[in-house]
UniProtKB/Swiss-Prot annotation:
Protein known as: Ribosomal RNA large subunit methyltransferase H
Family: Belongs to the RNA methyltransferase RlmH family.
Disulfide-bonded cysteines: none
Keywords: Cytoplasm, Methyltransferase, rRNA processing, S-adenosyl-L-methionine, Transferase
Cellular compartments annotated: Cytoplasm
Gene: rlmH
Quaternary structure and interacting proteins, as annotated: Homodimer.
First-listed, main subcellular location of the protein, grouped into a coarse class: cytoplasm
Organism for this UniProt entry: Methylobacterium sp. (strain 4-46)
SUPFAM superfamilies per the UniProt record, alphabetical: alpha/beta knot
Enzyme Commission number(s) of this protein: 2.1.1.177
Biological role stated in the UniProt entry: Specifically methylates the pseudouridine at position 1915 (m3Psi1915) in 23S rRNA.
MF annotations from Gene Ontology: rRNA (pseudouridine-N3-)-methyltransferase activity
Length: 162
């Protein structure tokens, strides 16, 4: 199953980028043995439209154009539902074992996501109700992908609840 992360905006050099690249490298090292690909990162430019609804629509169209047919889609949104790491691992395994060709995780722009992107999602996911900086969300998404892989591989990184 192909793994992809689509994010609006670029991560500048700094600690968030270093952490994101570190977790991505760790995930990539485990992926093949689990029937998964390395994580493909697509950074989309932020819209320069003047009005927020226009920016959301423009960025949404660019996001939708990046979603492969048949791919499972997780959209990061503060209004989404919280899922445990073990629950996320179960869902990823179910998509993989069910023959889904890919999994794409989407991080929208500063103005959020348009409804058409949310509608395309198989899972609207949140790390909580708080609004988080996009760079930090990217780090957390890649850490969770790595954690999912360690759970699927039986690696001791994820200790979970006793």
């Amino acid at each position: 199953m192909r793994l992809a992360l689509v994010a609006v905006g670029r991560l500048k050099r700094g600690p968030e980028r270093d952490l994101a690249e570190g977790y991505r490298a760790r995930a990539d090292a485990l992926a093949r043995g689990l029937g998964l690909s390395a994580v493909q990162l697509t950074e989309l430019p932020e819209s320069r439209a003047r009005r927020a609804p226009d920016r959301c629509a423009e960025e949404g169209a660019a996001i939708l154009a990046c979603l492969p047919a048949g791919s499972a889609v997780i959209v990061m949104d503060e209004g989404g539902r919280a899922v445990t790491s073990a629950g996320l691992a179960e869902q990823v395994a179910a998509w993989r074992d069910g023959g889904r060709p890919g999994l794409t995780i989407v991080i929208g722009g500063a103005d959020g996501l348009c409804e058409s992107v949310r509608h395309r999602a198989d899972l609207v996911f949140a790390f909580g109700a708080a609004t988080l900086p996009h760079g930090l969300v990217r780090v957390l998404v890649l850490e969770q992908l790595y954690r999912v892989m360690t759970i699927l591989a039986g690696h001791p990184y994820h200790r979970g609840a006793p």
